Regions:
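N-terminal export/membrane-targeting signals
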Residues: 1-21
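N-terminal presequence-like segments and the immediate start of the first folded domain
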Residues: 20-313, 318-367
Length: 367
């Protein structure tokens, strides 16, 4: 009897040890999958590009709001494939978390990752809102028969940072209307308008003014810095092209809009394909650091068969006026000086890297 009991005990112990060893082995072999990095550049069909802006939410903190924005986006694009996201983040949340959540969400849905730009702003138009996203997606069918129009930010400024923003927005939108008309497009062709403001105190009035002119467009409004050095309203836009330009890209500087040797006011893109990039950050504050950022951007474009000489529109996100001047100086070494791209540049609050002085993303023509 004692022998039988010992054999039973030994068997039970062996089973227990085997089970524990197997469980331990399984635990040891589990590997935490790191989020995939978004691509640095993507090629997309110009005639199928559509644009969305996520609604603001005050529910939860940055992570929840980012998840909710992505959920809304994936349910509101009508089957279009998201190829680019630009996220504006307000508050003290970690901007790097946005990148992680974008990667997780698209991977969970078995969708290709879009290129991504993340920029910190001073404030958003809803209290407690921490993120808003702009989406560029490829629709199932063509929606832009002749291509797209990208309009540079039309800036209006006042010296004092607390000056009211509504008169400045009125000036900016008047110039935007001039640009839309000069491109041969109508207000109903405008697909997205983004207004960068020094203050949101008069946001409701500014929004009503934009909505009255561009009712069918996706609209976005952000306060660029918490404590700007001067008052500003600068609205940029993307619109559908209404006529065949006969060229892949055509720069315009129409009468009524101040010309600049640094950038074009309007770019008409008739090319079948464009290359969209995520933001490339300059790590450091010296000219050499700025050049390295543009060199990395060039490599990203080259992987898709593009070049910085073929950039049609550039969005730059410097963190100070001094850095803005640096970007103006250095970018001329890389862009086509005879035909500089359209674009928007004004100081923002922050970037994902603490060491970054500025970031830049572009739309380039793929000929």
């Amino acid at each position: 009897m004692r022998r039988i009991w010992l054999l039973a005990l030994a068997g039970a112990l062996a089973v227990t040890l085997s089970s524990w060893g197997k469980k331990k082995k399984e635990e040891e072999t589990q590997v935490l999958q790191l989020p995939k990095d978004p691509p640095s550049a993507i090629t997309a069909e110009t005639r199928r590009l559509v644009f969305h802006v996520t609604p603001l939410s005050a529910k939860g903190l940055l992570s929840q709001q980012t998840r909710d924005a992505l959920k809304w986006l994936l349910h509101s694009t009508n089957g279009a494939t998201v190829v680019k996201l630009r996220a504006f983040v307000s508050g003290s949340g970690d901007l790097r978390r946005v990148r992680e959540l974008v990667s997780e969400t698209f991977t969970e849905h078995k969708l290709p990752l879009p290129v991504l730009s993340v920029v910190q702003v001073g404030a958003l138009p809803l209290e407690l809102a921490q993120v808003v996203m702009e989406s560029t997606a490829v629709a199932k069918k063509p929606v832009n028969d002749y291509g797209l129009v990208y309009i540079s930010g039309q800036g209006a400024y006042a010296a004092e940072p607390l000056d009211p923003v509504l008169p400045l927005a009125t000036q900016s939108l008047a110039r935007l209307a001039t640009a839309v008309k000069a491109a041969g497009s109508e207000p109903g062709d405008v697909a997205r308008v983004t207004c960068f403001l020094s203050s949101l105190d008069q946001f409701a009035a500014v929004r009503r003014m934009v909505e009255s002119n561009y009712a069918g467009a996706a609209l976005n409004f952000v306060q660029v810095q918490r404590a700007p050095t001067h008052a500003v309203a600068e609205c940029e836009a993307v619109a559908r092209l209404r006529w065949n330009t006969g060229t892949a890209v055509h720069m315009l500087n129409p009468e009524g809009l101040e010309p600049s040797p640094q950038f074009s006011q309007i770019v008409l893109i008739g090319a079948p394909k464009v290359i969209l990039t995520g933001s490339q950050e300059a790590f450091g504050f010296q000219d050499a650091d700025a050049r390295l950022a543009f060199e990395r951007l060039q490599k990203s474009l080259a992987q898709e068969g593009g070049s910085l000489h073929e950039v049609a529109f550039a969005s730059s996100y410097p963190l100070s006026t001094r850095i803005s001047e640096q970007v103006r100086k250095i970018r001329g070494e890389f862009y086509d000086r005879a035909h500089p791209p359209a674009g928007t540049m004004l100081p923002f609050q922050g970037l994902p890297s603490m060491d970054a002085g500025f970031a830049v993303d572009v739309v380039a023509v793929k000929e």
